């Protein structure tokens, strides 16, 4: 077991430099760790599983996977389940949290493995390696990148210089080698098709000084062909999609669909891969590593050569020999290779045969090749070019990362593609699985055997457990005597080298000698090997040809004759025509590199990461139990746990055991402090004894304490948690009282702050309004009310209400514009032959412009449209008078329409909004006159006149504004009034006959007013107002029976009280029926078509005061029709004590604009009562409506308005066919017929057409909202 880091240690490097650390004092336990540490799902270390079965392992991994915990330990082995998504667990904060921490202190993570490897290197002065294994798509490459990320972050202490350069180059190898060595397969979008062993070299200070990469098993056959729905190496798609115009011109590049090698499989794009951006990342990695521009051009020239070689197509001639269908393609390929085109065609079509007699050189013949042979030679050349190019890139990277100073230690990271089982398994799968068998052998020897050796070393009594040793499978593949599979392949290749089919048959015959091996089965033209991961059936066809791995001498002569020096660098070996030595086969190379890898790994201290793929669909939520059980079996996880649990499930050094559990013994702890004075071993024994653990459940080793069953450890952890709860209960009694008092005080403070915070924003805006006016303008009394708030969007444009949506669409306001202010206004409109007149408008201000929207009746239909749009940048100044009127002029740049003059009751708020949006870069002119542009070249002046006879809003006539006196210009707003105290509700009595009204309170007349004021409209969510129906006459006897209390035995029932006298007859009431739906604003009454309301007052300006459900409000008179009342019936019997309320009808649920609870928020045309009922402006009720505002009546005529027809919905535009991609100009080279990818076009999503602006059907909109409200109520 690795030595644990000491608590309080600041860094691994410091500990390494200081030599052996002294025994450290046990730190005081921290009670808060149980509250701050996240509770893990399942068990984080599977050695603590109660049941050791594959199913139990799978259940634990599944629970943790579903809880987004993908890492689990088996002792020091990390199990990683690929999450197929970003869990946010690789950030710098997470990385730093593992820095300098022991494995047991933190939850399982790949950073913990990296920290352990780096720490052991610096403290034990030994080389380390991290072996990552698992099947394709299980996350090995990602784990390797995270290991390098951690080591690069924690190693070294100096910034800049060579150390940082080495770190950058090490990290830059990831995108570079992924581009050239990874490809999309059926199981993985970024599958490593080669093995990579990265060795990071460190100096004595623990700082990286260099690195070296060793490449294994590049799958070069993928260059010339792939199965369906797979791709070639990423670099080909990056190159063809992301190359610059200069590259395309130099190399004759087209899209990936133009090349047979990379388009034949029908997969050109991958959703999870952006080839263009990845190509830019590859170029940056080349620059970081130090590749010159000439070297980069040479690399891309070889890639282009491979692509054009694949487009050389062979056809069968009349004589049965192969011929090139388009010599122009061969000419361009020869141009890229810098060889003679005729020589290239000859090498591809002819083969040189040489006869020998008795060791003497004989005759030389040129033998024509058929189509299959020519294609094989072309593919062999392409594969050799790519393989040697990849080897050159690796060697070039090693040159750049070569250490400049001596290195002392190494941390190796092995990332090699995992065990593979396909439907058709060939030589590539045999090689891959062989290497994985070797890695499994290392795991068995170094992990399972080391586990048993630890028990022996610690002198622990235990029973050994047998485990599967896969060395017999490795011998089956690699042994020479008796001949293994590789040796048999070599013999078959040597005896029938001229005919691949004959060589395959020879191998089948020779492999029959392997049938005696229990792990081998011959099955005709196939054979089966029983690997540790499962049985794999291999196909013999083509296996001997792949094992040859040599180019014919004709192709080597062709390359030797090239004028490209880079090509000579890729093929440094000269052709020896006299050599009779058999070149090494692919099997020989694989066996040699695998044994060298094993030798390197055996010289290091290993760390293991076993990766698991949860499903085959790369889904972040799917968990395939069957597939994972198979991986658990062949990874040997159960055997690993059994060996770890053979004697004892948990072990820890004495110091760590004491640090964790010393609280459980009164002899070792007092008040949380460690008080034991003896040695650590005796301290552990005392803790376990006082915890009442049986002696057979634990043993003491030489340096560690061992616990047999995981239940014992769980018990100790539970007792440790219970200790803190017991101690906490003693403190809680005294603490609760303090906390209660503190909480009550905090609640009071919070309540006060919340109340102030809500009004603070509006008070700041209001104060800014005072600054804008600067004491120059008389103020309206209602503008100075303390409850006056600058709400802004009074028409609810941004709130999504029906009216807001209608106005937004009519004004054509884009969704990107933010509405800051909206209100009703009256625009001064000049008409031919008549004086100017105020006309109602909707005023909207966004962050870009000011909008004036008008509603008009045209052909019996209400039409709302945009009248004028004024960009904020065109407003030069704002002009107002110095009296209390509401007139405002926007002085804009010269235009035909001139400057708009309008009135707005929220003028101060409107000006503050405009100044805020424009940054205050405009002047506000306040004076006795308003100077404005009536037209483009025509100026005009509006004068003011103070007239005390004008009681309501200002009047306008002949360029003169008449208005009464207002509050002094230097007036300030009143403070916010305190909230009313809550009224305690009286207890209900059984004899109460007063009906309960859950609606708004009844209106009460203000001082000086003759009529009660209408209550302000409720803001926030729309509510359904209950409707109270007239009580139905019920016989008195029935009433008494219904309300009689239950009888009490032995007591006579008291007679019921006499009914109250009937109320005196009042004046006759007039009821009217609503003809249309109407949604009103503040002080107005909502109407639903068909309902009846009582008319309380009729005004000449077209608005009537109506009563509905005990509430009053204004409604348009031409929306109502009188209901003829029947003759009054005879007086009914006494009414019951409680009226019966009928079910309320559906009310409109259209949300209204936020209401303001003071007079300044009420438009002038709503304040009728103040102008007609009292001579003082101070007594004007907030919801009254002046008689001088007849122009604000929405229906302009008294006649019954016709119901507009619903406008037709514009037809949905037809979805056109997807246009064919534009094909660039054909390069000046001919192209051979190519294999096009499979058609996989999908119709794109078509956005729904936007709503047509302009006229909207208000009646239909209100009816639709009323129906929706009815559905919600039902």
UniProtKB/Swiss-Prot annotation:
Record's keyword terms, sorted: Actin-binding, ATP-binding, Cytoplasm, Cytoskeleton, Hydrolase, Motor protein, Myosin, Nucleotide-binding, Phosphoprotein, Repeat, SH3 domain
Highest taxon of source: Eukaryota
Domain TH1 positions: 779-969
Compositional bias ranges of the Pro residues kind: 1054-1067, 1126-1138
Domain Myosin motor: 41-721
UniProt GO MF annotations: actin filament binding; Arp2/3 complex binding; ATP binding; hydrolase activity; microfilament motor activity
Record PTM: Phosphorylation of the TEDS site (Ser-363) is required for the polarization of the actin cytoskeleton. Phosphorylation probably activates the myosin-I ATPase activity.
Full protein name: Myosin-1
The organism of origin for this protein: Cryptococcus neoformans var. neoformans serotype D (strain JEC21 / ATCC MYA-565)
Lineage summary: Eukaryota, Fungi, Dikarya, Basidiomycota, Agaricomycotina
Underlying gene: MYO1
